[in-house]
């Protein structure tokens, strides 16, 4: 008889930028690595490397000079299943060192994902990896489990996509979910672009990684953008140095807050979309008038692109300006929000009430991929 510990469910949050994977019941993911697959530019150049045809995650990053990179997930949706399969293979066998056929696997997906995407995910889990049981849960429902609040409005912003998801009594309200194809990767691109104004050029995918690092270390959100710009003209207090991998040191100033400002003003990068504050407001306004007070009073931030210092205060200020004046606005930025979707999945997969959500291999064999729409919410 297998030990209960051996059948811990695996939880895999496949982000556009990073894969977060680990075991249900843990409080943080064991493996966090970039969602990239690199292939050698020229076959046969790497002598004695025992030439692999593909490298995944950190290994692809460390060999960046000789590989071309691909991101199999764009805007939260898988666009290259062969590469995605490589990422999952790497997750199970190299990172977690488990045999997927012995575990239930919980995968997360972006809300409003195409149905075919969800079917294909399930199919690969059963047919390629022979998983014991699988389930797909929408990212936000998972984030809610971590927040433990009955009614909340979740703003989840990752690398490829942002969503606002109102949650009431533990359920996401699908009619009010709004999707914004603006997230971390766009901010990285924008930072690279405004750095060219200073005469620095970052164009290759490897250089973009340096810019991402700079963004994560130095960017912040201004409470008042115009005021911050004025301040920069008269003082150098905003300026910070950043050392590039080759030892060159560059100085950045206003770029630090001009970069994530795009979240509030997408028009800066030519996007005709509402900012994250307005999208959150629109999403709340799509809900029943009786629950809006609860949603305004519990706006929960989640995902890596909500990690910028100053985001909660700015969000609070912007939503207060949009909402009725009597409304009490509270923006919550939990410290573990970078992994809140994964943590929520970990909690969810270990709940006894979740056990009926798993799709067993036998059910899949009988009904085919479409079973995923009946069982997963």
UniProtKB/Swiss-Prot annotation:
One matching Pfam family, short form? Actin
Q: Name one GO biological process term.
A: cell division
How is this protein annotated for GO cellular component? actin cytoskeleton; cytosol
Subcellular location, record wording: Cytoplasm, Cytoskeleton
Documented EC number(s): 3.6.4.-
Keyword flag Zinc-finger: no
The record, for InterPro entries, names: Actin, Actin/actin-like_CS, Actin_CS, ATPase_NBD
Q: Where, if anywhere, are coiled coils annotated?
A: none
Function in brief: Actins are highly conserved proteins that are involved in various types of cell motility and are ubiquitously expressed in all eukaryotic cells. Essential component of cell cytoskeleton; plays an important role in cytoplasmic streaming, cell shape determination, cell division, organelle movement and extension growth.
Further notes on this entry?
Answer: There are at least 13 actin genes in potato.
Q: What is this protein called?
A: Actin-75
The primary gene name is AC75
């Amino acid at each position: 008889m297998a030990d209960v510990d051996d059948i811990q469910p695996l939880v895999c949050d496949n982000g556009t930028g990073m894969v977060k994977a680990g075991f249900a019941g843990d409080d943080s993911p064991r493996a966090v690595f970039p969602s990239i697959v690199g292939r050698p530019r020229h076959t046969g150049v790497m002598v004695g490397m025992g030439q692999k045809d593909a490298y995944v995650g950190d290994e692809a990053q460390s060999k960046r000079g000789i590989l071309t990179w691909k991101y199999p997930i764009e805007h939260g949706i898988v666009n290259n299943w062969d590469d995605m399969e490589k990422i999952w293979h790497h997750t199970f066998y190299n990172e977690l060192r488990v045999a997927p056929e012995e575990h239930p696997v919980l995968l997360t997906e972006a809300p409003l994902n195409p149905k075919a995407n969800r079917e294909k995910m399930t199919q690969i889990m059963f047919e390629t990896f022979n998983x014991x049981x699988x389930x797909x849960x929408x990212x936000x429902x998972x984030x809610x489990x971590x927040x433990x609040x009955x009614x909340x409005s979740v703003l989840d912003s990752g690398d490829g996509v942002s969503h606002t998801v109102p949650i009431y009594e533990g359920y996401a309200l699908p009619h009010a979910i709004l999707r914004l194809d603006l997230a971390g990767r766009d901010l990285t691109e924008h930072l690279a672009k405004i750095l060219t104004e200073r005469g620095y050029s970052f164009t290759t995918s490897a250089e973009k990684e340096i810019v991402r690092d700079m963004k994560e270390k130095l960017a912040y959100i201004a409470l008042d953008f115009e005021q911050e710009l004025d301040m920069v003209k008269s003082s150098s207090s905003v300026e910070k140095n950043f050392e590039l991998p080759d030892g060159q040191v560059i100085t950045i100033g206003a770029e630090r807050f001009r970069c994530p400002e795009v979240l509030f003003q997408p028009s800066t990068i030519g996007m005709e979309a509402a900012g994250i504050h307005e999208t959150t407001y629109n999403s709340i306004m799509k809900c029943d008038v009786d629950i809006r007070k609860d949603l305004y009073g519990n706006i929960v931030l989640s995902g890596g692109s909500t990690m910028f210092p100053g985001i909660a205060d700015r969000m609070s200020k912007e939503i207060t300006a949009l909402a009725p004046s009597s409304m009490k606005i509270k923006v919550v930025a939990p410290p573990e929000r970078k992994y809140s979707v994964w943590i929520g999945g970990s909690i969810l997969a270990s709940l006894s009430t979740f056990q009926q959500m798993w799709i067993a291999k036998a059910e899949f064999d009988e009904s085919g991929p479409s079973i995923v729409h009946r069982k997963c919410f």
